[in-house]
A protein has these predicted regions:
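Metallo-beta-lactamase
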Residues: 12-105
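Active-site HxH/HxHxD metal-binding segment of metal-dependent hydrolases
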Residues: 1-9
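C-terminal regulatory/interaction regions
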Residues: 111-184
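Residues that act as N-cap/strand-start positions at coil-to-secondary-structure junctions
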Residues: 1-2, 22, 168
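Residue-level detector of beta-strand structural context in well-folded domains
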Residues: 3-4, 26, 172
Length: 184
């Protein structure tokens, strides 16, 4: 529960609300060692997709407030939900604020980022999939359809998916082998 403490091992960890990525997210902070378990609230190079924003609920301000909380805690070590443990929290917070500012100024950029993330995580599960199977999955997945309808309706769904695949290829996250998309 936020604003409480939990004993993990022999250390008391503070529980802090960290809405943004998810309205019910928390971070854990162990003040003696200055260790923060940040979940998806802060990564070394960003933060998690802000799902409420994609669904039409304003949550970018909550991400900013969560970054303020983390900054006030002044962690010496951050254990993120994704990526390596890191020690330069001020740099990570500054980078996260710049990314957030870009998303606030251009919400479509956030929606595109989210679509690529969702596709990449599914590709991590599959490891490879025929492009026809990918198209069938995208068409049958309600959240993916909502993302397209809400943020990219002006682009035909098949062209949008093709563009997402091309973005994953450009970034080195995937490659095509014939008619199959392969995770990298």
């Amino acid at each position: 529960m936020p604003d409480s403490c939990v004993l993990l091992g022999d250390k008391p960890w503070q529980v802090h609300a960290a809405p943004g990525h998810d309205p019910h997210s928390v971070v854990l902070f162990e003040p003696q060692g200055g260790v923060l378990i940040s979940a998806d609230a802060l990564w070394e190079n960003g933060f998690g997709v802000v799902f409420p924003e994609l669904e039409g609920e304003g949550a970018f301000a909550e991400v900013a407030a969560t970054l303020d909380v983390i900054e006030k805690l002044s962690p010496r070590v951050v254990i993120p939900g994704h990526g390596p443990v890191f020690a330069d929290a001020p740099r990570a917070i500054d980078g996260a604020r710049r990314r957030l500012d870009g998303f606030v100024r251009n919400p479509a950029k956030h929606a595109l980022y989210a679509a690529k993330v969702l596709l990449k995580y599914k590709l991590l599960e599959w490891q490879q999939i025929p492009l026809a199977g990918l198209a069938a999955w995208a068409q049958a997945t309600p959240y993916f359809g909502m993302l397209h309808a809400r943020h990219f309706a002006e682009v035909p769904a098949d062209a949008w998916l093709h563009g997402l695949v091309a973005e994953l290829e450009r970034s080195g996250a995937a490659r095509r082998e014939g008619l199959t998309l392969v995770n990298l």
